Regions:
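Transmembrane helical cores of multi-pass secondary ion antiporters/exchangers
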Residues: 1-408
Length: 408
């Protein structure tokens, strides 16, 4: 009966998600906002159609292997040739930038919600990740200048695993209840190193096994090979203290840039593989946001409306511009203009990875997880409704569209 219940709930989640797609298109609203609202309506607080308690087998799979697949997909779209000219700025945004954003948000969250610095930092770390899944179709529609578009998308893809690592490290400190010397810093560094090594090994293995060379013995089974390898990498990383999310992302980068390693795939097999990854990612995105809506505490959201909106103002108007300025201005090779910096400061949407991390924290009953989930919900709604809808207008005003000249 338990298996039947899981299958029923998963089927209903997908049904709710699929119904939301045409509604979002009809209303010209961001899909993820509609998915959250649909989840709320389907949840116990409104219709009672869905009840998906966090911590079950189904939600654990979505928030672990599902997110690893999303990060693999993000890495798959990164072109090392394209981002080489802005590599310094990207690395600064991805590592110290994530930490700086988390720290600034934490300073605001502490007095507003009356929580400890550790819990406030946990909230900031989860919010620090952005979402390439939202930005890619948005920029394709706008025709944004390639340098800006590719940098913002690459930053979003790279800082997702970094935000996840920082979040899980801080969550460990919060759960332990104390800061044990350099332990968290050591764990953070070890997670990164192990994650990179595992990711490189897994990416090379996947690229070779699916190649057009004699070694491509699994080229006709890309879906099963991908799932098996991602699962193996995820649980291996968890077992030895590495970042499974970073490993999945790095593996995606390796496969996406296989031509630099002189590894070729047949066009047919490559299209099948990329199509499978994209479709699987779509399913996970639908599930994550509907599950968030189902488990959303509307009372908690309304009770924290004012401090939540103040936190979002600090997040958008202070933390992001300060981080972008400190990380990109020193990047001489990038030759960033003021208008480009303004656009990059404004354009950052909160999406699936922060939502999934918040869900994982709730599942593990980490102290402060409800606050984190509430703030992530605010961030999703505010950034998608405010920033995503005004990005085109701002890009046009700043002269950052292809063929446009910057206004004087």
């Amino acid at each position: 009966m338990e298996i039947e219940g899981i299958l029923r709930e998963f089927g209903l989640v997908l049904a709710v998600g699929l119904v939301s797609v045409p509604i979002a298109r009809l209303l010209h609203l961001p899909l993820m906002v509609v998915l959250v609202v649909a989840g709320v309506i389907a949840g116990q607080s409104v219709t009672g159609l869905l009840s998906i308690p966090l911590g079950g087998v189904d939600t654990e799979l979505v928030f672990t292997l599902g997110v690893a697949l999303i990060l693999f997909h993000g890495g798959l779209g990164i072109s090392l040739r394209v981002i080489s000219k802005t590599a310094v700025g990207l690395l600064l945004l991805a590592v110290p930038g994530v930490m700086l954003t988390a720290a600034i948000v934490a300073v605001a969250v502490m007095p507003l919600f009356g929580v400890s610095f550790q819990i406030a930092l946990l909230a900031g770390a989860v919010l620090a990740a952005t979402d390439p899944a939202i930005l890619i179709p948005l920029f394709d529609t706008l025709g944004l200048r390639a340098k800006v578009a590719q940098t913002v998308v690459a930053e979003s893809a790279i800082n997702d695993p970094m935000g996840a690592i920082l979040s899980l490290t801080v969550a460990g400190v919060v759960t332990a209840g104390s800061l044990d010397g350099f332990g968290p810093a050591t764990d953070f560094a070890r997670s990164i190193v192990i994650g990179i090594v595992l990711g490189v090994v897994a990416g090379l293995a996947l690229a070779v096994l699916l190649s057009s060379h004699w070694s491509g013995v699994l080229r006709d089974s890309p879906a099963a090979t991908l799932l098996a390898l991602v699962a193996l990498v995820y649980f291996s990383a968890e077992a030895i203290g590495g970042s499974a999310y970073l490993a999945a992302f790095i593996a995606g980068v390796i496969v996406g840039n296989k031509e630099l390693l002189r590894i070729s795939h047949h066009d047919h097999h490559e299209q099948l593989f990329e199509g499978y990854v994209a479709q699987t990612t779509d399913i996970v995105v639908l599930a994550v946001f509907v599950i968030l809506g189902v488990n959303l505490d509307l009372g908690l959201l309304l009770d924290n409306l004012v401090p939540g909106l103040i936190t979002m103002a600090v997040f958008i108007l202070i933390a992001r511009p300060v981080t972008v300025g400190l990380c990109l201005i020193p990047d001489r090779r990038g030759r960033w203009t003021r208008r480009e910096l303004v656009f990059i400061s404004w354009c950052r949407e909160t999406g699936v990875v922060p939502v999934a991390i918040a869900g994982a924290l709730l599942s593990d009953q980490v102290p402060g997880a409800e606050l984190v989930s509430t703030l992530v919900t605010f961030a999703v709604l505010v950034t998608l409704l405010l920033q995503a809808t005004t990005a085109g207008w701002l890009a046009a005003r700043l002269g950052l569209l292809d063929g446009a000249t910057e206004p004087r």
